[in-house]
Amino acid sequence: FVESVACPSREFAQRRFLIKTDAELNDIMATSAVEVSINVLLGLDPDGRAPEARPSKSTSDRARAEVRKEISQSAKALKTSLGDLVAGRSVDMAHLTQAAEDNAGIWSDSTVVALEVTRLKSKDETTYVHSLAVSGMMTLLARSLEMDEETTGILGVAGMLHDIGKLLIPSEILTKPGKLTDQERLVIRNHPEAGYRLLQSYPDLPPVVLDICRLHHEALDGSGYPLGLKQKDLSVPVRLSTVCDVFEALTSVRPYKRPWTSTEALDWMFARPHFFDRKMVIRLGSVIADAPLH
């Protein structure tokens, strides 16, 4: 399914369509098209059928229990590391990097199970498991985009630290089950800036880690926060982090809503190109669609 075709001659302006035959593909290749954006979620299988429902994501109880145990242990370790950062204590950055690599391994080996396990979080571990999930998805997406291993590792660390500002929010606001007041909402919205200021005191952190902490709630049209930056001022790593962060939030269990399916979340984000980088949304969909079911 073609979402858009970049053509100097504008043959396909504002058109979205499904390619069903080789002849149709050849017709596109004969135009001035220089780039085609594909939506794998709306396409057909090679035999012309719409994709069938994927096999059940349920795996053996043993596999799920093992992944749950690994993520729980990682969440406890991350809680300690983030607590040290908030308290101003020195933190071994090599340890953080290794933790991000270990977490990436879980997500690479057991993507579907990790998605299942991290959707349901206890109140006490929400921020930490969310951060691990975002970190894992960011590394998967970075590798899919063929970023080098050093950059991928840094993005893994950035995912783990992106919500550290939430630890500076009073717990009665952060975990409030009901509707937030306007003032409470302002406190919540301050967490990217608060986290950024905290991480500034750690000069060993790469600049992109601070950028992602500060800017992961920005939107391409400038309607995000805290700075209201627009597309031209938002780097690829920041756009990547935004897509992973929102996807994880939408597909997680919350007291006030059911978790969205992966397809629902991806479709919702894809329909909002003024907020999210569509190429990142499509690529994340591909990563999840190609994930091993074990």
Give residue ranges: language-model regions:
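Histidine- and acidic-residue-rich, metal-dependent catalytic cores
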Residues: 74-294
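Non-catalytic interface/linker regions that flank or bridge core catalytic/transmembrane domains
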Residues: 1-121, 125-126
